[in-house]
């Protein structure tokens, strides 16, 4: 089905029924900053190159009216794990996000099997793509991030150890970070594979590429770094369990170098096979291939 209004979009994506939802034109939210909850089994895809969500973002979670009423806004807490239907099997593709009052995309509350692909995500009020609260098996690929500060968070708090440990398996690849400042991503507890991304911000201050937080487990390879500030940074709370492998296939053309590199992170090839693009080719590849308007729907 094709939607052109905010009300139609809410109705189309908030339940758990399988549905392909095509967004046509620009959809605005009438002034609310609330994120729209996304239910299971949804493909949300923009039509053409200009499909735009303006003023709001998408919340891939169990945060919908019936759960809020039943659990009194506490449904994402550890005590309620397994007591409601988690959101799963979601694709968000070929959309432009502008002027979001909160996050552009939020994945939380044990949501799993989510693919965020070929979107253009302009500076939001908070995070651009945040993944947290026990979510799992997420891929963030071929997106263009523009001017964001808090770009991508993986786990929201050091107190989330019980909820997040053993989950938060996320692949980040072929993303273009254009004039963004930090969190590409910033990781706690999760297992993140960060490969073939381009950090493109040589002028901003207070910048870093990957933030290593409590018990993070990160494998980074084939990235092209042209960003002011630290390339990998201990956020001050990484602790003895944090691991990061900074592979020799990464290329740093500008930046303060690698502050944190234990060399003993997980091996992503134990999960899937992949072929790296040469890091030096990423500016050309991603200017042509990242963001909305590249895939045809």
Residue ranges and their predicted role:
Residues 12, 31-34, 49, 54-58, ...:
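Short glycine/acidic-rich loop motifs that flank beta-strands on beta-rich extracellular proteins
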Residues 1-7:
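Right-handed parallel beta-helix/beta-solenoid
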Residues 186-189, 193-297:
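Extracellular beta-rich repeat passengers
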Residues 40-46, 68-71, 86-99, 111-125, ...:
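Right-handed parallel beta-helix
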Residues 10-18, 27-43, 52-91, 99-110:
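Extracellular beta-strand-rich solenoid/capping regions of secreted or surface-exposed proteins
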């Amino acid at each position: 089905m094709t939607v052109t209004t905010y009300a139609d979009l809410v109705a189309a994506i908030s339940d758990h029924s399988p549905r392909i939802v095509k967004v046509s034109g620009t959809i605005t939210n009438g002034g609310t900053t609330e994120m729209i909850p996304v239910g299971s089994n949804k493909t949300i895809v923009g039509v053409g190159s200009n499909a735009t969500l303006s003023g709001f973002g998408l919340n891939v979670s169990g945060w919908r009216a019936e759960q809020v009423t039943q659990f009194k806004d506490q449904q994402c807490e550890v005590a309620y794990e397994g007591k409601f239907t988690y959101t799963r099997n979601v694709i968000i593709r070929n959309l432009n996000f502008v002027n979001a009052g909160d996050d552009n995309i939020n994945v939380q509350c044990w949501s799993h099997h989510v693919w965020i692909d070929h979107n253009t995500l302009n500076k939001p009020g908070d995070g651009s793509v945040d993944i947290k609260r026990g979510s799992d098996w997420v891929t963030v690929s071929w997106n263009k991030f523009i001017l964001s500060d808090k770009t991508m968070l993986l786990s929201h708090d050091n107190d989330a150890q019980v909820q997040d440990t053993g989950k938060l398996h996320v692949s980040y690849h072929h993303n273009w970070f254009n004039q963004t400042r930090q969190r590409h991503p910033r990781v706690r507890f999760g297992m993140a594979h960060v490969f073939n991304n381009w950090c493109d911000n040589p002028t901003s201050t207070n910048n870093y590429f990957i933030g290593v937080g409590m018990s993070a487990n990160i494998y980074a390879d084939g990235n092209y770094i042209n960003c002011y500030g630290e390339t990998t940074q201990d956020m001050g709370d990484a602790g003895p369990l944090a691991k990061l492998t900074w592979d020799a296939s990464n290329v740093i053309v500008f930046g303060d170098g690698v502050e944190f590199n234990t060399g003993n992170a997980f091996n992503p090839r134990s999960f899937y096979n992949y072929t790296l693009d040469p890091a030096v080719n990423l500016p050309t590849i991603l200017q042509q291939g990242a963001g909305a308007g590249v895939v045809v729907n």
